[in-house]
From Swiss-Prot:
Gene: murE
Protein name: UDP-N-acetylmuramoyl-L-alanyl-D-glutamate--2,6-diaminopimelate ligase
Residues that, per the record, bind UDP-N-acetyl-alpha-D-muramoyl-L-alanyl-D-glutamate: 24, 26, 41-43, 154-156, 182, 188, 190
SUPFAM superfamilies according to UniProt: MurD-like peptide ligases, catalytic domain, MurD-like peptide ligases, peptide-binding domain, MurE/MurF N-terminal domain
Record pathway: Cell wall biogenesis; peptidoglycan biosynthesis
Localization terms from the record: Cytoplasm
EC number(s) from the headed UniProt entry: 6.3.2.13
InterPro entries, A to Z: Mur-like_cat_sf (IPR036565), Mur_ligase_C (IPR004101), Mur_ligase_C_dom_sf (IPR036615), Mur_ligase_cen (IPR013221), Mur_ligase_N (IPR000713), MurE/MurF_N (IPR035911), UDP-N-AcMur-Glu-dNH2Pim_ligase (IPR005761)
The organism of origin for this protein: Pasteurella multocida (strain Pm70)
Lineage: Bacteria, Pseudomonadati, Pseudomonadota, Gammaproteobacteria, Pasteurellales
Catalytic activity, as annotated: UDP-N-acetyl-alpha-D-muramoyl-L-alanyl-D-glutamate + meso-2,6-diaminopimelate + ATP = UDP-N-acetyl-alpha-D-muramoyl-L-alanyl-gamma-D-glutamyl-meso-2,6-diaminopimelate + ADP + phosphate + H(+)
Gene3D superfamilies linked to this entry: Mur ligase, C-terminal domain (3.90.190.20), Mur-like, catalytic domain (3.40.1190.10), MurE/MurF, N-terminal domain (3.40.1390.10)
PTM notes: Carboxylation is probably crucial for Mg(2+) binding and, consequently, for the gamma-phosphate positioning of ATP.
Alphabetical UniProt keywords: ATP-binding, Cell cycle, Cell division, Cell shape, Cell wall biogenesis/degradation, Cytoplasm, Ligase, Magnesium, Nucleotide-binding, Peptidoglycan synthesis
Length: 494
C-alpha cells in the first residue's frame, strides 16, 4: 500500500489516499488503484479518466504539457486528478517509488541490441542459478523466475510494468534479474529509473526502422542504456561496428570479441583465441584481463559463441570466480526451440529451431553445418494462410545449404497441405532428390533413421511451439518430443 503523499509530496487537495497499484490501462482499473493517464504514441489515456473513475480508481495522475499546471489538482466525483508535467519521462521513477525501488534489491542486468537479447538473458539466468542464485528474466518469451515464465506482450513492458515485475521478482526471493531492453523501451523511458549493475550491447542491424527512421537514431536509442542510464559495468561486442565506436568513447567498458586477432585497447577485455565446433557443441579457448582458459559449450552456432562470451564477461565483471564459471558452462542449454541440440549415443544429432523465414533458415543451416562432420539433413515445411512468396525461396535455401531435404507439414491451417508442398517444390532445382512426407512426426523419424551417427538433422519451423494447426484445429505436437521418443526407443542400436 502506498500513500499518495509519499509519491508526490504534499499535493494540495490530495488527501492521504492509500493506493494498491499503478495502472495505465483504464480497462484494468480496480478499486484502490492509481490510474496513470499518459499521452501515448497511439492513444491518449486522458480520454479514459471518466471510465477509470467509474471503475473505482482512488486517484488519477494525468500528463500535462504545461509546466505551470504541474501538480495542480482538481476533484471529480470525489477523486483527485493530479496534473504532472512530462509524466512519461518520470513514470519509471514514480513507479520505482511506488514499488519501493526493487532494482536496488537485486543484481540487475540489461541487454540491448538487435539479436541475442533473449538467449543472453536466458543464459545469465541459467548460469547464475547454477551458481546458487534465484534468477528471473524479463523479455520476449515472458517474465518470471527461471522455469516459471509467464508470457508477455512487449519485449520491454511499460515503465510501470517493469517496476511492478521487478517488485514481484523480489517478493518471490529473486536476487538476480536479466531483462531485455528494446530500443522502443529506451526511447519511451521505460527503464529510466532502474539501477543496472550491468548493461550489455549485442549488435545492431536493420530492425524496427519504421519506428526510428534511420540507423543512426536506432544506434542512439540503444546507446542511452550505456550513457544516460546508470549502469556500473558496460559489456560491448567489439565485433560490431557500432560497438567499436562506443568502445572508443567508453574506456571503462569491457570489450568482447570472437576474433582471434582482436587487439584490445580497454583495461578489461575478453576474446576467443581458438574455437572448435563439433556435434557436442563448441570448445572455446579464451584470453582475458581476468585470466585464460577453455569453455566447453553445448550451444550451437557462431552467434552463440558471441552470446556466451558476452555473458561470461558480464559474470566476470560482477566478480564471479573464473574456475567456477568454466566448470558450470557445459550445463547451459540456451533457449528452448532455438538451435536446441538433442542427442543420444550412436544416433545422429538433431537440432530443433524455430527458423520459419528464408533468412533464418539459411542462418540455421549454416550454423548446423559448423557442427556437422557427416551430412546435413533439413526437415521443414511452410505455414498455411501465410506468406506464399517465401515457399520457393526456402526450398532454394534448403537445397543450397543441406545435403538431404525432407519437406513436411507445418501448420497447414485451412490451406491444402498438398498445395503448400507444391509451392515449396517449385523452388527446387532438382525436386526429384527431395522427399515429401506430410506427417511431421514421420518426416522427422525418417530423417533420423536414414541419417548416420555423424550426420546432423535440422528440424526447422516450430522451435518451442507444441502444436500443429490443421484446418482450424490445434493439435498437440512437439518436434522435441518426437525426437526424444525416437531416441528412447532406438538408443540401444549400435
Amino acid at each position: 500500500m502506498r500513500r499518495l503523499t509519499a509519491l508526490l509530496g504534499q499535493v494540495e487537495l490530495a488527501p492521504n489516499i492509500e493506493l494498491t497499484e499503478m495502472i495505465l490501462d483504464s480497462r484494468a482499473v480496480k478499486q484502490g488503484c492509481l490510474f496513470v493517464a499518459l499521452q501515448g504514441h497511439q492513444v491518449d489515456g486522458r480520454q479514459y479518466i471518466p471510465q477509470a473513475i467509474a471503475k473505482g480508481a482512488s486517484a488519477v495522475l494525468a500528463e500535462t504539457e504545461d509546466a505551470q499546471q504541474h501538480l495542480s489538482t482538481k476533484i471529480e466525483q470525489g477523486v483527485p486528478i493530479i496534473s504532472f508535467y512530462q509524466l512519461g519521462s518520470h513514470l519509471s521513477a514514480l513507479a520505482g517509488l511506488f514499488y519501493d525501488n526493487p532494482s536496488h534489491k537485486l543484481t540487475l542486468v540489461g541487454v540491448t541490441g538487435t539479436n541475442g537479447k533473449t538467449t543472453i538473458s536466458q543464459l545469465l539466468a541459467q548460469w547464475t542459478t547454477l551458481l546458487g542464485h534465484r534468477s528471473a528474466v524479463m523479455g520476449t518469451i515472458g517474465n518470471g523466475l527461471l522455469g516459471q515464465v509467464k508470457e508477455a506482450t512487449n519485449t520491454t513492458g511499460s515503465a510501470v510494468e517493469v517496476q511492478a515485475s521487478l517488485a514481484d521478482f523480489v517478493k518471490r526471493g529473486a536476487d538476480f534479474a536479466a531483462i531485455e531492453v528494446s530500443s522502443h523501451g529506451l526511447v519511451q523511458h521505460r527503464v529510466e529509473a532502474l539501477a543496472f549493475d550491468v548493461a550489455i550491447f549485442t549488435n545492431l542491424s536493420r530492425d524496427h526502422l519504421d519506428y526510428h527512421q534511420s540507423m543512426e537514431n536506432y544506434a542512439l536509442a540503444k546507446k542511452r542504456l550505456f550513457t544516460e542510464l546508470n549502469s556500473r559495468h558496460q559489456i560491448i561486442n567489439a565485433d560490431d561496428s557500432v560497438g567499436q565506436t562506443w568502445l572508443q568513447e567508453q574506456p571503462n567498458a569491457v570489450a568482447v570479441s570472437c576474433q582471434t586477432d582482436f587487439k584490445p585497447h580497454q583495461a578489461r577485455w575478453l576474446k576467443a583465441t581458438a574455437i572448435q565446433f563439433s556435434q557436442k557443441g563448441a570448445r572455446i579457448q579464451f584470453e582475458s584481463s581476468w585470466g585464460k582458459g577453455e569453455l566447453h559449450s553445448a550451444l550451437i552456432g557462431q552467434f552463440n559463441v558471441s552470446n556466451l562470451l558476452l555473458v561470461f564477461a558480464t559474470l566476470l565483471s560482477l566478480g564471479y570466480d573464473i574456475e567456477k564459471l568454466m566448470k558450470t558452462v557445459p550445463q547451459l542449454t540456451g533457449v528452448c526451440g532455438r538451435m536446441e541440440r538433442l542427442s543420444a549415443s550412436n544416433q545422429p544429432t538433431a537440432i530443433v529451431d524455430y527458423a520459419h523465414t528464408p533468412d533464418a533458415l539459411e542462418k540455421a543451416l549454416q550454423a548446423a553445418r559448423l557442427h556437422c562432420q557427416g551430412k546435413l539433413w533439413c526437415v521443414f515445411g511452410c505455414g498455411g494462410d501465410r506468406d506464399r512468396g517465401k515457399r520457393p525461396i526456402m526450398a532454394k535455401i534448403a537445397e543450397q545449404f543441406a545435403d538431404h531435404v525432407i519437406v513436411t507439414d507445418d501448420n497447414p491451417r485451412t490451406e491444402s497441405a498438398a498445395q503448400i508442398v507444391q509451392d515449396i517444390l517449385a523452388g527446387f532445382e532438382h525436386p526429384q532428390h527431395v522427399e515429401v512426407c506430410h506427417a511431421r512426426d514421420q518426416a522427422i523419424i525418417q530423417a533420423l533413421q536414414k541419417a548416420d551417427s555423424d550426420d546432423v538433422v535440422l528440424i526447422a519451423g516450430k522451435g518451442h511451439e507444441d502444436y500443429q494447426i490443421i484446418g482450424t484445429q490445434k493439435q498437440h505436437f512437439s518436434d522435441q518430443e518426437t525426437v526424444q521418443q525416437y531416441f528412447k526407443v532406438n538408443h540401444h542400436h549400435a
